[in-house]
């Protein structure tokens, strides 16, 4: 922490506009700290990384990240509003909270990323022998450090959670859905499904292998209840119908401003769960899908229907109802171009 007070502190106290401050300092911002009248300690760790420590002892350490992809604006707007409410003293926290705007430069240019997809660089994938560093790789390494530091300073026995908030490139038959990272054999939690349902998310995709995502990092390294949460479709700033995110914002607010949040009793019938059937990577320059760019996530295919063509290799649906998630024919060679999923039931692997 710098011994001198950064120039931006007084303006931030007045406006609460940490988003604009971060956008004006795309890759670095000097650390700073101040205390609100209600006793909450505000710590700016870097551009896009701000921590709130309530005056009272907390039982949860909560991370909300957005702008890991800079053009996914609805989650950015939600987090911007929450940060402003906290700094204005309108929202009194009961739990420690770390807010992250992942990639401020990509926000400014209105694209998913600048040089490289940030959400392919976590869990150590930012530093690979023979691969030169760039701003996004450096940023991923720093974000891991900030999350590690935040969790390490929590109260002993505190629960840890990280919700990485996104919107999807294309529409979805299930507008909002979450990705539950691979837990390496540990049970899934019904309580987390209840939290997601309270956010307006009743569709959950269960991953079956390690990943390079921010949410997998927090789950695997820190044991956090962690999810990638897709809240709808990508739209420019000012074009989001924020009423569609009211339940999400209310639930995110309650988690950090209440000692304990009560959710409705668990009912398996309220959820649609899917498990990954397979991953299709792009390995050739010539890669295409037979469906249009308007094809929605969770669109199902009949057994034998063409799903993708990678060079001379066709991929056909090999089970009835095999559904597509995150199709993107423009990914870099070697990266995932498509996930396919099949329905699953809530079973004994849930607690």
UniProtKB/Swiss-Prot annotation:
Q: What class of enzyme is it?
A: hydrolase
**Gene3D superfamilies to which the protein is assigned, alphabetical:** Zn peptidases
Q: Which cofactor does it need?
A: Zn(2+)
Tell me the cofactor note: Binds 1 zinc ion per subunit.
Catalytic activity reads: N-succinyl-L-glutamate + H2O = L-glutamate + succinate
Q: Which domain of life is it from?
A: Bacteria
What job does this protein perform?
Answer: Transforms N(2)-succinylglutamate into succinate and glutamate.
Q: What family, per the record?
A: Belongs to the AspA/AstE family. Succinylglutamate desuccinylase subfamily.
- Name assigned to this protein: Succinylglutamate desuccinylase
Q: Origin organism of this chain? A: Pseudoalteromonas translucida (strain TAC 125)
Origin organism lineage: Bacteria, Pseudomonadati, Pseudomonadota, Gammaproteobacteria, Alteromonadales
């Amino acid at each position: 922490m710098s011994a001198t007070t950064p120039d931006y502190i007084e303006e931030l106290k007045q406006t609460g506009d940490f988003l604009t401050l971060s956008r004006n300092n795309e890759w670095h911002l000097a650390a700073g700290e101040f205390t609100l009248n209600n006793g909450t300690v505000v710590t700016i760790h870097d551009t896009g990384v701000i921590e709130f420590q309530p005056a009272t002892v907390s039982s949860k350490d909560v991370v909300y990240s957005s702008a890991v992809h800079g053009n996914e604006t609805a989650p950015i707007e939600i987090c911007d509003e929450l940060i402003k409410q906290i700094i204005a003293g309108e929202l009194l926290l009961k739990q420690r909270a770390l807010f992250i705007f992942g990639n401020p430069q990509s926000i400014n240019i209105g694209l998913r990323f600048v040089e490289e997809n940030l959400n392919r660089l976590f869990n150590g994938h930012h530093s690979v022998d023979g691969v030169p560093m760039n701003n996004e790789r450096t940023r991923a390494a720093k974000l891991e450090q900030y999350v590690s530091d935040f969790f390490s300073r929590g109260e002993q026995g505190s629960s840890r959670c990280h919700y990485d908030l996104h919107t999807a490139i294309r529409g979805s038959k299930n507008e909002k859905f979450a990705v539950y990272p691979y837990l390496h054999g540990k049970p899934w939690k019904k309580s987390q499904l209840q939290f997601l349902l309270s956010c307006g998310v009743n569709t959950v995709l269960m991953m079956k292998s390690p990943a390079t995502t921010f949410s997998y990092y927090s789950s695997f390294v820190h044991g956090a209840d962690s999810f990638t949460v897709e809240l709808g479709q990508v739209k420019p700033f000012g074009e989001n119908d924020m009423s569609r995110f009211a339940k999400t914002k209310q639930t995110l607010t309650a988690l950090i401003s209440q000692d304990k949040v009560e959710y409705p009793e668990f009912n398996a019938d309220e959820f649609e769960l899917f498990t990954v059937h397979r991953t299709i990577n792009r390995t050739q320059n010539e890669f295409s899908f037979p469906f249009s760019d308007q094809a929605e996530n969770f669109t199902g295919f009949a057994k034998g229907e063409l799903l993708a063509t990678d060079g001379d290799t066709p991929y056909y649906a090999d089970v009835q109802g095999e559904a597509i998630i995150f199709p993107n024919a423009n990914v870099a060679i070697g990266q995932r171009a498509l996930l396919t999923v099949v329905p699953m039931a809530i079973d004994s692997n849930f607690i």
